[in-house]
Every structure is written in C-alpha cells, then in structure tokens.
Amino acid sequence: METLEAIRIDLADYEYAGEGANGVSYNHRHNPDVMLKLYRPGLVQQPLDEMNIARKVYEAGIPTPEPGDFVTDGTRYGVRFRRIRNKVSYARAVGDHPENLVRYAEEFAQMCRLLHATHVDTTAFECVKDKYSRQLVENPFFTPAEKDRLLRFILDAPDTDTAIHGDLQYGNALFVGDERYFIDLGDFGYGYPLFDIGMVYATAYISEPDFVREAFHMEPATSVRFWQAFAPVYFGTDRPIRDIEAEVRPYAGLKTIIVERDMGKPMPTFREALKPILHP
C-alpha cells in the first residue's frame, strides 16, 4: 500500500459544489481553476489510488481534468483537480433538458467509442478481468458453483489492450462547449469494452428507480430512452437492439459483484441479469 503525506487545507477556502456516492466536491473561493473532491471519513487509500490512476490516465491522453495534490481537511482525504468551469455532466444535462436527450446520448456514445478505441500501457493499469476475478473471490454471497460459472464467463471474454473507464455512466462524463471529459477514474483499466457498456445498460434497466432519480437527476423511463438512443450509435444501426441487449445484459449483471460487496447483502434485481450465466 502506497503512503503519501497529505497536504493540509483549510476548508474555509472552498465552497460546496455537490456530492456523489463516495464524497463531496468543492470549488476554491479564490481560484476558479481549482476544485476539490473529499472522500467520506475513513477513506484514505481510495482517494490516493484515484489520484495516482487519474495522473496516469491524464498522461495517457485520455480527456480528463488534470489531477493535483493529495490533501486532507483533518478529517477527510481527497484530491485537488483542475476545475472545468461551466461544465455539465450528461446526466444533469438530460435531467434539465430532456428535449435534447437524443443529442446527448449520441455525444456520449461517441465519447465511449473513442475511449474504447484507445490503446493503453497494460503495465500501468489493471486488466478488467483481473479486477472482476479478484472481487468475485471477495464476494461472500455467491455459492462456489456460481463463482465457478461467473469466473468462467469473465475469463472467456475477449482480451484487448483498450481503455476501460470502470464506472462508465453519464454522470461521469462532462462537457463544456466542444470539450468532453471523463471523471471518477479510480477504477480505470483495460479490457473488453462490454465490461464498461454493461454499466450504461444497468443504469437504464437494473438500478433502483430512486437511485436513478438521485444519482442521475432523471426519471427511470428517461434513462431507458437514453440507452435506446445510445445503443445504435455505439454498436451501429445494423443490429437489432434486442440482440445488443442480450449480449450486454450479462456484463451489466457482473456489477452484482461490486454492488453486493458495497451493500453487504444479496441484490436480487442485479442478480436477475446474471441468469444467462448462472442458469444457461
């Protein structure tokens, strides 16, 4: 485990900007080019890991805000980034302007296509297969037989050296004017793109309705429409969407491994998507 002395900051120099599942964001009161993300109390290694990965991702040429210092306010730890002024996430944009949903979905799909066509240094990042295999071992809610089937599915996925965001959903993609950025890259790696696309599908068809409303600022039906506009642009219009969904759904179900770990209990809604793997 890497250690690094965190720079002490005065939170009075920052103003609240928003929050997500892992922490709270702030903007610097006196420097408009600096923003801060502080993780929940007790999380130290996670923000350090995110900073290190974000720096590697930035240096690899992936469009993402430039990371700065590892910091603490005395209770929480986090990272300073270059602030992208006037930026909007695709989730917020769809929630505020659903009449532009198709355009936003198409732009996000093109971002994802470019990301998944980007070759990366495989010595610098974790293979997505290795990540899921490791997390599967740590999940206490699957039987040994279920773990065997899931592991076989994971390992049978094609091998590629192209970029994987790791938490690919439209709240983690920003735009301002013609510029586009990915954020929250703590799980960045490389591998088969459907491990990523499964998350986009999950936000439409698997995530709990209240979670969609809170995290993505839209009604569940709107998230379904977003997926239906996204899929033909990402996969091409020559494939029926039902065939696309049949291929993607098991990868969406793999999020069960992570969600159950975080929630500390089995998640039947997510497990439903694993039926093609567990009960072929």
Task: Label the predicted regions.
Residues 1-5, 117-166, 170-171, 176:
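An alpha-helical support segment within catalytic cores of ATP-dependent transferases
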Residues 33, 78, 161-163, 180, ...:
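Hydrophobic "anchor" residues on beta-strands that sit immediately upstream
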